[in-house]
Amino acid sequence: MVSYNIGFGAYEDDYSFFMDGGTESWAWSKERLDENLSLIAQTLKDQMADYYFIQEVDTDSTRSYHRNEADILRRALTGYSSVWGQNYDSPFLFWPLTQPHGSSVSGLMTFSSAPIASSLRRSLPIETGVMKLVDLDRCYTVSRVPMENGRELILYAVHLSAYTSDGTIAIKQMEMLLDDMQAEYEKGNYCVCGGDFNKDLLGNSDQVFGISAGDYTWAQPVPAELFSGKNIAKIAPLDQDNPVPSCRNADAPYHSGQYVVTVDGFLVSDNVTVSSATVIDTGFAYSDHNPVTMTFTLQP
């Protein structure tokens, strides 16, 4: 299984984004965007995974030259069932003045090598007031894959909030997601969630990667008490011998000493056995995230 926030194909290693304190609001050019999307698609294909979760996939956005990136990924991952969940539909944003961000339609995707019987989109609680303007229409998708033993593998694709005033909304989002997964587990189903949690999944990324978070407070650890009474576990991808972060701060081009953190990962129910979870080191060449992988088996 692979999860990858592709950053709408714009975040090359020399890219910074205005909403993160950087300068850019569009991909550098149509040509560079297309090249990045091609490399992203090839990276995904190379993993030969059974399941993929992909975030920040634009379908009709000014910032990505109105490329339908969902169609590009579908063509790359032929033979897979796919699900699209829209989590960003923004009218024309006239900022920054030098190159307005424009309008955006974006979402997250799930790909499965086994047929998906049904899927739905569930809205998550989001900020109100001014913060709502910079946050997405947060959601997660729920896709059901029938198993031979009569149970279902429930695939949850998620991208939680980053731009919040005090972190309360992100906690409420996690609570809703975990309650949903727990309910499905109690029915006897297998539950696996993958995506960008915008939380420090390791809990100590600054120590693991040797770079202080400093004033960057957007990626807080996930409170352990959220899992109390739940049969759900957090899986933070990490190779102890060669630790690689899953995300870089996008307030400047990628450079040595830049703040990095692991925010991409997985949640699994107790009847799912995880054998490995790692981060693929792309050097942040075509996204501000690295893809993360997890190998697992379903218990009888």
State each model region's role.
Residues T23-S29, V57-T59, L124-L133, H159-T168:
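Surface-exposed cleft-lining segments at the edges of enzyme active sites
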Residues M1-I6, N36-H66, F111, S143, ...:
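Active-site beta-strand/loop signature of hydrolases that rely on acidic residues for catalysis
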